[in-house]
């Protein structure tokens, strides 16, 4: 061994530290370097002239304002990188690109308020990460994607806002083998000082929906009904001024709805479809000229009129509904004339024939078929009395009860949620109502101001139970059922364009997209698209 080597061994044995100076130009100003490590303090910018074999680098109180992409490409051998008491506030994407051997990354006691979602990309050997004591209010989703070797993460000392932006972090923590120190929330006020790991992700409501305008169908309409035929969704509109039932289908080339077939039907108020195997039926309820049944026996044929329905009973139909009784399809047509009567029409052979007359002389405006306690029921609304509930027994409908405190109800629609049956009752002026079935009676649950309402339509779209309250004088309101409260809460207004005298709403899923149809009496039918928005993104 040479003399210099022996001297170094003796000095080391005596406890004397001898700083190793790399070749000239390999230890920047304001840095202290040893053979495999460097400490830089007070440097005005990011030092770069290090030995390419450097293993450890500490940067303290530098003048760096941000870490840009590729900041450490010249020292790919780093195993440890430490930042403390620096003034930089932003870490950009790929700031640590090229550091595939880095195991320890400590970014502590700095002024970082923003870190890009791909800032840590490529750190495939990282085991220890600390972002403690910075100014981070949130972290971008997927920040830790690809960091499969992490064993320790320290996020303490940051003023996290515990809103939807941290939801992904709460969901991520249980899925990794790393120990994670998260610290406490700085806000909102209701969660201030609560430890992040005590938060329940299930309590966060971070999903929003929006209905945005998609398409206009020119003529006005009174009803809109979805149906599926030969595996393809369709819509049929009752267009009284155009004198037809218009069937729409999806144009896959133009990505829009287009007319497929129309059925001449003067003064039509409702077009009700029924699919039985290869056969398609459409009931066209008309104010004048008699209601008709149209049929298509098999695909490839056009719909053709096959039957005039109960001409002596259906004098002024106002609504038509489809229901199944003892395995057979039936239509119920609500008749609004004093001389006519609401009629139940059931299939018999090739046609549909009167099975029962209901509620004569009451000028019914609406019929709603529903199931209560496992049995078919029918609810009729009329201009002369409160809605009446009928139940199916002995092969016919018998009166069961009426709905208390429900005067001047124009129409009723029901929906199910959480095992309960709810009822939406439409009133033109005053308060429309939401009721819930208690096993023997519908009880009032909620009242909503009506301003010229002819429709209060519940719709289940994706995971959301919605209800739309139409208005002839203002914007129609979309409401959503909040499961925690069991009440409908305002979601949005429909428009622009504003709906002009809306009369019916329907939902259809087409090509993986969800659409809402709004049939309007004094304006064109409007189509809206349903969008889901992730607020935690």
From Swiss-Prot:
<dbReference type="GO" id="GO:0008344">
    <property type="term" value="P:adult locomotory behavior"/>
</dbReference>
<dbReference type="GO" id="GO:0031641">
    <property type="term" value="P:regulation of myelination"/>
</dbReference>
<keyword id="KW-0225">Disease variant</keyword>
<feature type="repeat" description="EAR 3">
    <location>
        <begin position="302"/>
        <end position="349"/>
    </location>
</feature>
<dbReference type="GO" id="GO:0042551">
    <property type="term" value="P:neuron maturation"/>
</dbReference>
<keyword id="KW-0677">Repeat</keyword>
<dbReference type="Pfam" id="PF03736">
    <property type="entry name" value="EPTP"/>
</dbReference>
<feature type="repeat" description="EAR 2">
    <location>
        <begin position="256"/>
        <end position="298"/>
    </location>
</feature>
<feature type="repeat" description="EAR 7">
    <location>
        <begin position="487"/>
        <end position="532"/>
    </location>
</feature>
<feature type="repeat" description="LRR 1">
    <location>
        <begin position="53"/>
        <end position="74"/>
    </location>
</feature>
<feature type="repeat" description="EAR 6">
    <location>
        <begin position="441"/>
        <end position="483"/>
    </location>
</feature>
<feature type="repeat" description="LRR 2">
    <location>
        <begin position="77"/>
        <end position="98"/>
    </location>
</feature>
<feature type="repeat" description="LRR 3">
    <location>
        <begin position="101"/>
        <end position="122"/>
    </location>
</feature>
<keyword id="KW-0964">Secreted</keyword>
<feature type="domain" description="LRRCT">
    <location>
        <begin position="158"/>
        <end position="208"/>
    </location>
</feature>
<dbReference type="InterPro" id="IPR000483">
    <property type="entry name" value="Cys-rich_flank_reg_C"/>
</dbReference>
<feature type="signal peptide">
    <location>
        <begin position="1"/>
        <end position="19"/>
    </location>
</feature>
<dbReference type="InterPro" id="IPR005492">
    <property type="entry name" value="EPTP"/>
</dbReference>
<comment type="function">
    <text>Component of Schwann cell signaling pathway(s) that controls axon segregation and myelin formation.</text>
</comment>
<dbReference type="Pfam" id="PF13855">
    <property type="entry name" value="LRR_8"/>
</dbReference>
<dbReference type="GO" id="GO:0005615">
    <property type="term" value="C:extracellular space"/>
</dbReference>
<dbReference type="GO" id="GO:0005576">
    <property type="term" value="C:extracellular region"/>
</dbReference>
<dbReference type="InterPro" id="IPR032675">
    <property type="entry name" value="LRR_dom_sf"/>
</dbReference>
<keyword id="KW-0433">Leucine-rich repeat</keyword>
<feature type="repeat" description="EAR 5">
    <location>
        <begin position="396"/>
        <end position="439"/>
    </location>
</feature>
<feature type="repeat" description="LRR 4">
    <location>
        <begin position="125"/>
        <end position="146"/>
    </location>
</feature>
<dbReference type="InterPro" id="IPR001611">
    <property type="entry name" value="Leu-rich_rpt"/>
</dbReference>
<dbReference type="GO" id="GO:0014009">
    <property type="term" value="P:glial cell proliferation"/>
</dbReference>
<dbReference type="InterPro" id="IPR009039">
    <property type="entry name" value="EAR"/>
</dbReference>
<keyword id="KW-0732">Signal</keyword>
<feature type="glycosylation site" description="N-linked (GlcNAc...) asparagine">
    <location>
        <position position="177"/>
    </location>
</feature>
<keyword id="KW-0325">Glycoprotein</keyword>
<dbReference type="InterPro" id="IPR003591">
    <property type="entry name" value="Leu-rich_rpt_typical-subtyp"/>
</dbReference>
<dbReference type="GO" id="GO:0022011">
    <property type="term" value="P:myelination in peripheral nervous system"/>
</dbReference>
<protein>
    <recommendedName>
        <fullName>Leucine-rich repeat LGI family member 4</fullName>
    </recommendedName>
</protein>
<comment type="subunit">
    <text>Can bind to ADAM11, ADAM22 and ADAM23.</text>
</comment>
<dbReference type="InterPro" id="IPR051295">
    <property type="entry name" value="LGI_related"/>
</dbReference>
<feature type="repeat" description="EAR 4">
    <location>
        <begin position="351"/>
        <end position="394"/>
    </location>
</feature>
<feature type="repeat" description="EAR 1">
    <location>
        <begin position="210"/>
        <end position="252"/>
    </location>
</feature>
């Amino acid at each position: 061994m040479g003399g210099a080597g022996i001297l170094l061994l003796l000095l080391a044995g005596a406890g004397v530290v001898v700083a190793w100076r790399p070749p000239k130009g390999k230890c920047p100003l304001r840095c202290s370097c040893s053979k495999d490590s460097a400490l830089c303090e007070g440097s005005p910018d990011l030092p770069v002239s290090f030995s390419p074999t450097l293993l450890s680098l500490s940067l303290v109180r530098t003048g760096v304002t941000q870490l840009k992409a590729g900041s450490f490409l010249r020292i790919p051998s780093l195993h440890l990188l430490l930042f403390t008491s620096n003034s930089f506030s932003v870490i950009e994407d790929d700031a640590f690109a090229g550091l595939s051997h880095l195991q320890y990354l400590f970014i502590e006691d700095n002024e970082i308020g923003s870190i890009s979602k791909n800032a840590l990309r490529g750190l495939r050997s990282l085991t220890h990460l600390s972002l403690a004591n910075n100014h981070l209010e949130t972290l971008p989703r997927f920040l830790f994607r690809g960091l499969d070797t992490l064993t320790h993460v320290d996020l303490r000392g940051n003023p996290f806002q515990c809103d939807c932006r941290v939801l992904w972090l709460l969901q991520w923590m249980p899925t990794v083998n790393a120990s994670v120190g998260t610290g406490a929330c700085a806000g909102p006020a209701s969660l201030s000082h609560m430890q992040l790991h005590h938060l329940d992700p299930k309590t966060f409501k971070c999903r929003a929906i929006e209905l945005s305008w998609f398409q206009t169908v020119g003529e006005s309409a009174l009803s809109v009904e979805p149906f599926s035929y030969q595996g393809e969704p369709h819509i049929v509109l009752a267009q009284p001024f155009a004198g037809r039932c218009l069937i729409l289908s999806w144009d896959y080339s133009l990505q829009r709805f287009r007319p497929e077939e129309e059925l001449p039907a003067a003064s039509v108020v409702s077009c009700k479809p029924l699919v039985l195997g290869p056969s398609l039926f459409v009931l066209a309820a008309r104010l004048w000229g008699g209601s008709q049944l149209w049929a298509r026996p098999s695909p490839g044929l056009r719909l053709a009129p096959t039957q005039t329905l109960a001409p002596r009973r259906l004098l002024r139909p106002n609504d038509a509904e489809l229901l199944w009784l003892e395995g057979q399809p039936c239509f119920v047509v609500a008749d609004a004339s004093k001389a006519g009567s609401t009629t139940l029409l059931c299939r018999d052979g090739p046609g549909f024939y009167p099975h029962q007359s209901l509620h004569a002389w009451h000028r019914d405006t609406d019929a709603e078929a529903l199931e209560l306690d496992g049995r078919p029921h029918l609810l009729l609304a009329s201009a002369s009395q409160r809605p009446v509930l009928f139940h199916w027994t002995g092969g016919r409908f018998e009166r069961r009860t009426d709905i208390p405190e429900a005067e001047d109800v124009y129409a009723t629609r029901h929906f199910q949620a959480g095992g309960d049956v709810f009822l939406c009752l439409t009133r033109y002026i005053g308060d429309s109502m939401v009721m819930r079935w208690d096993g023997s009676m519908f009880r009032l649950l909620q009242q909503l101001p009506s301003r010229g309402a002819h429709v209060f339509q519940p719709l289940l779209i994706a995971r959301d139970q919605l209800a739309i309250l139409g208005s002839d004088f203002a914007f129609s309101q979309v409401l959503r059922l909040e499961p925690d409260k069991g009440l409908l809460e305002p979601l949005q207004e429909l428009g622009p364009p504003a709906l002009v005298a809306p009369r019916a709403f329907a939902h259809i899923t087409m090509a993986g997209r969800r659409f809402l149809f709004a049939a309007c009496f004094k304006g064109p039918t409007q189509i809206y698209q349903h969008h889901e928005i992730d607020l935690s993104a």
